[in-house]
Amino acid sequence: MRQEWVAPRRGQANVSQMHYARQGIITEEMTYVAKRENLSPELIRSEIARGRLIIPANINHLNLEPMAIGIASKCKVNANIGASPNSSNINEELEKLHLAVKYGADTVMDLSTGGGNLDEIRTAIINASPVPIGTVPIYQAVESVHGNIEKLTPEDFLHIIEKHAGQGVDYMTIHAGILIEHLPLVKTRLTGIVSRGGGIIAKWMLHHHKQNPLYTHFDEIIEIFKRYDVSFSLGDSLRPGCTHDASDAAQLAELKTLGQLTRRAWEHDVQVMVEGPGHVPMDQIEFNVKKQMEECSEAPFYVLGPLVTDIAPGYDHITSAIGAALAGWYGTAMLCYVTPKEHLGLPNAEDVRNGLIAYKIAAHAADIARHRPGARDRDDELSIARYNFDWNRQFQLSLDPDRAKEYHDETLPADIYKTAEFCSMCGPKFCPMQTKVDADAITELEKFLASQNQDNLTPV
């Protein structure tokens, strides 16, 4: 599909969607996204031009089905996958990718740090993925120097970033916002720096007593991104790792820098979204979303969670989905899922499923709350099917049809029960939805009530 779209653009100095949007050009990707979002192509173009919406679409990711991330579009969900030195391999990661796409992931990030040849893993994932792929290139940079962070050079970072761009990565987390002057601000934290990429950059700066090389070489990264239409996902290296640390001076200092970098990228027509926390109490979530919009000139916000409490290891897909729903309601554009394994280990396929469904619920709830066009249509369809005891239609409309059917069939497995007017909760005699209040009955009742009211008005 995209082969024909991108062919005329190849060799141009800037092939970004923002570059075309600012020239008044509606690209094929914009038209495609407009249909998916039930919005006009001109609205999509104008939102991209002003930086409030991005279409992450590397010109080398040819099997991509373009999608939008921004406040005008539906709230999106990202799923993280990736092999580690201690667990997983390329086949397991491809299984996770297929599962993530099956259950509705809008984008997928490959966070591989080991488990095989990172280039082969990444290429296989991109070639198999119809959704945008994001990466964190700093991980491979560290792997290239065998974990000796202090040996990394700016050229090492730029080489890996160019490699990822050439392979077709649609967006990259770039940890350019953490500055050497920010590091003293973390000393009052309970959990310090919890971003892997942020920790790597912090260690490098502490060793060399030099400024963040991703910050000092930001313009060179921009030039790479222009050539391939890679979108920035500006990493929040100083995101809070516990609710105690939320909204502190370190987080907000970096956020201000991220806003400056956003506008710098926009000067070159490069698309940007900004990453956010993390661990945030419920009463601080609105502040965090509004503060990001203010500091980053309304660039799309992409948050991890946030978790609203720290005491539920094994259930952090729930603690974070609560925060994610609120963040989406307040205007966050994309939610990065959290699995039940968060803080405990590398997620397996079932963890990916559970985390993703929790976040699809959160994103959908946010769409309903923000009154996005058509957001509640599926809910209404399912409610009608439920009222009519159309079990198969209910399963079909569910976010996880397999799970819905599995739970129903645990107690009523026979096909005959797919037409039954009850489930095992209430049984055949106590289901309230069996009480069908039809139009004729209502008409008779209204006549009766009217007569009663008339009698009450009659003088004694």
Curated annotation (Swiss-Prot):
Keyword Iron attached: yes
Cellular component terms per the entry's GO annotation: cytosol
EC class name: lyase
Keyword annotations of the record: 4Fe-4S, Iron, Iron-sulfur, Lyase, Metal-binding, S-adenosyl-L-methionine, Thiamine biosynthesis, Zinc
EC number: 4.1.99.17
Binding-site positions, substrate: N80, M109, Y139, H175, S195, R196, G197, D236, S237, L238, R239, E275, Y302
Entry binding sites for Zn(2+): H279, H343
InterPro entries: ThiC (IPR037509), ThiC/Bza_core_dom (IPR038521), ThiC/BzaA/B (IPR002817)
Record pathway: Cofactor biosynthesis; thiamine diphosphate biosynthesis
One annotated GO molecular function: 4 iron, 4 sulfur cluster binding
Disulfide bridges in this chain: none
Cofactor: [4Fe-4S] cluster
GO biological processes: thiamine biosynthetic process; thiamine diphosphate biosynthetic process
Cofactor stoichiometry and binding remark: Binds 1 [4Fe-4S] cluster per subunit. The cluster is coordinated with 3 cysteines and an exchangeable S-adenosyl-L-methionine.
Function as written in the Swiss-Prot or TrEMBL entry: Catalyzes the synthesis of the hydroxymethylpyrimidine phosphate (HMP-P) moiety of thiamine from aminoimidazole ribotide (AIR) in a radical S-adenosyl-L-methionine (SAM)-dependent reaction.
Family label: Belongs to the ThiC family.
Protein name: Phosphomethylpyrimidine synthase
Gene from which the chain derives: thiC
